[in-house]
Each structure stands twice: as C-alpha cells, then as structure tokens.
C-alpha cells in the first residue's frame, strides 16, 4: 500500500474556462490540501483569481494547448521532477472534488492509493469501456492498431483524476508518451492521452483500477465486453448510467461538473457540510478566493434550507 507522505506529488491542471472551473480549483485547494503532500499547479494560460499560497505549493505557467495533456507534457519536460517523488496524482479542473462524507477519517489521496499494487499500472476515479464503433475508438485503431482485447471495447481510466507510480511515469517518459509537439483536437487528445495511457500499461501486463467497485472485478488485460448495461457509450459518469443509477459524489470523489449529474446547488451543499469536518488548513495563505467560495456554498446551503421550509409550510396551509 502506498503511504501518503512528502514523496507524493499532486499535479493539478488549472484552466479558467468559466466560473465552474474556478470553483473546482478553489474546492480542490480547500479540501485536498494537506501539509504532508506536495502540489504542482499547472496553469494553462492565465489565472484571474488570487492564488492560494503554501510552502508545498508550486505554480507553473504553461501554454494553453492540448488540454491537460499538453500542460502535463510541458511541465514534465521543463521541470524533470519524475525521480524526486515516489508517486503522482494527476487532477484537472474539469472536475470538482474531493467529496468525502463527514465521517471519513481517511486522507482523500488514500482512497486512491489503497487500490494500488504491483500489478496495477494506474488507479483513477472511473474506468470507461468505449465501444469499438465509437468514433474515437475508430481513430485509435486507425493510428495504433487493434489488439485482441479491443475488438469490442477500449478500456481506459478516465484522465480527470488518476495515480501513477514513479516507475510507471518514468517508463512513459522514456517511451516518448509526453513528447507532444503538434496541436491536437479534443478527440485526438482523448485518443493519444486518455486512451493511449491505459492501453500502454495494459500492453505492459499491468491492470487498471478505479474507485467504483463494480469496475474492479474484471481483468482489463483480457476483458472484451461491456460490464455495465446502462453505461452511455461505455461511460458510467452520466445520469442513470451507473448500473441504472447516478454515481454519488462520495463514490466517485470527483465529479465532472459539465455533465450536471449533480447540480451546482447540491455540490455546494455538500461542500458546506464538509467544511465543518475539513476546515481550511492554517498553512494556507492568500485564501480570499477560497473564503469567497466557502461563503457562496454557505449561502446556497442556508437559502436552500429556508426555501424547503417555506414550501413545506405553504402546502401545510392547504392541507390543514
């Protein structure tokens, strides 16, 4: 089992697409920051907010190209940090998290690390089984060929949040995985980054794991069929696409906000509850933006409670 300590580097790709992405970043710093971890924030383009500061947080400005793949490729090339840490967590700002129940005593990173072992190449929050008829699967097969296991599905850990060990990252660097020079479309980025990453590791004899338990039973080195009948094109991250229901933020820990599987109001209410169990760490400074996010979550939570009471009182008046 991987231990959470100062040999872990958390690499967060931050892009200010809209207010939701800003809130995703602020939520992450508030609830994912731990003094015993190291943080490298890769900023794609510019940052308009006051950036939280701490001795174990480093900011790196990268060219806004090829999404998080491009940012990671640039920072890995420029900083050459791969031998300085034992394990790496990659997170991008399209997701909000971590979300943890108030009774959770475990460091958020341990939820990922507990699934890691010598025969596992990558651990993420979710695994997709993209069908072979999907346009991006066809793009992948055209460029990289079609392995026996990929005739019906193309399994891959989603790249919004995942863990790699030092040995795995070093092997990827050595094999040229991060040597990206041309501009890629969104589909090409999914093909060359998200899909290719997992497929390289599977070809090396390493398996995949994620936080969703149903997806940890198969051996993806040989799996050739869909395991979730309600998945949308192999993706369990949509409404009612996780074995007939919607994944709860506490299960996935990170939620892709653009899909609206959980409303911004609901996520804010969860964040408000979490703030009592996980207060802002005293080691952080320049936290005005985080405090603003905290106040917005509090306002949403308290106003929602007030509205519910008023609605109940309204109907009670007619039923009395």
Report each predicted region and the residues it spans.
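ER/Golgi luminal nucleotide-sugar-dependent glycosyltransferases, focusing on the catalytic module
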Residues: 1-320
């Amino acid at each position: 089992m991987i231990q959470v300590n100062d040999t872990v580097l958390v690499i967060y790709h931050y892009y200010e697409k809209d207010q939701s992405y800003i809130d995703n970043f602020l939520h992450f710093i508030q609830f994912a920051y731990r003094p015993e971890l190291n943080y490298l924030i890769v900023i794609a383009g510019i940052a308009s907010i006051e950036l939280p500061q701490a001795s174990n947080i480093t900011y790196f400005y990268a060219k806004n190209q090829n999404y998080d793949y491009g940012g990671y490729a640039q920072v890995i090339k420029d900083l050459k940090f791969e031998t300085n840490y034992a394990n790496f967590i990659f997170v991008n700002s399209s997701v909000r998290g971590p979300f943890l129940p108030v009774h959770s005593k475990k460091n958020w990173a341990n939820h990922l690390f507990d699934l890691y072992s010598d025969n596992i190449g990558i651990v993420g929050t979710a695994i997709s089984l993209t069908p072979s008829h999907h346009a991006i699967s066809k793009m992948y097969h055209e460029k990289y060929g079609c392995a026996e296991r990929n005739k019906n599905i193309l399994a891959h850990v989603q790249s919004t949040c995942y863990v790699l060990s030092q040995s795995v990252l070093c092997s990827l660097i050595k094999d040229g995985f991060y040597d990206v020079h041309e501009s890629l479309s969104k589909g090409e980025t999914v093909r060359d980054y998200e899909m290719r990453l997992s497929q390289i590791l599977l070809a090396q004899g390493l398996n995949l794991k994620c936080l969703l338990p149903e997806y940890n039973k198969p051996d993806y080195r040989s799996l050739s069929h869909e395991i979730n009948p309600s998945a949308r094109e192999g993706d369990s991250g949509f409404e009612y696409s996780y074995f007939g229901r919607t994944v709860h933020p506490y299960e996935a820990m990170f939620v892709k906000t653009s899909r609206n599987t959980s409303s911004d109001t609901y996520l804010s209410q969860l964040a408000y509850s979490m703030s009592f169990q996980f207060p802002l760490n005293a080691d952080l400074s320049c936290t005005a933006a985080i405090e603003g996010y905290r106040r917005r979550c509090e306002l949403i939570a308290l106003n929602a409670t007030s509205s519910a009471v008023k609605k109940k009182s309204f109907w009670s008046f007619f039923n009395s």
